[in-house]
Amino acid sequence: MPLTIRQALREDIPHLCHLMKELSGHEISQEEMNNRLEFIEDSPFDSLYVCEENGAILGLLGFRIRENLEEVSKYGEISVIVVDSGARRKGVGRFLMNYAEKLAFEKGCIGTWLVSGFGREEQAHPFYKELGYEITGYRFVKRF
């Protein structure tokens, strides 16, 4: 059966928590994930999608529309992308990235971008480069 993408639902929360733990290495409670889904549902700019095959959730895509004031344009931000460790190297990540690019194009964006942290140079970064993404800068963070 082919891969499909749909909006994330409340009943997906246990799977979403699992995928986010695979991405970050940290547990996220179902309550916290529910809060994040509520935020996304209330936002006109944010969306959360799951990728399925035969009803099994294999991946997660967070997508956000970002206004770029410097260029007076919009970009589609891939705010989260994660594929279940048991489904990697099977086209799920590429399918999700293609979907994000299609969404961005349909919403009048001039491109897509994402942030990928240190420690992902072996797998994620070559994958993004293969898809045509370029490293264009650094992200600076100050935690409170």
Predicted regions and their residues:
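Residue-level recognition of the GNAT/N-acetyltransferase active site
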Residues: L9, R66, D84, R88, ...
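Conserved acetyl-CoA pyrophosphate-binding loop and the N-cap/start of the following alpha-helix
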Residues: A87, G91-Y99
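Conserved active-site alpha-helix within GNAT-family acetyltransferase domains
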Residues: R94, F118-G137
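Conserved GNAT acetyl-CoA-binding A-motif
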Residues: A104-S116
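Acetyl-CoA-dependent GNAT
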Residues: Q7-E11, H18-S73, S79, R143
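Short hydrophobic/aromatic beta-strand or adjacent loop that forms the aromatic wall/cage
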Residues: D46, I135-F140
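Conserved acetyl-CoA binding element of GNAT-fold acetyltransferases
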Residues: S73-S85, Y138
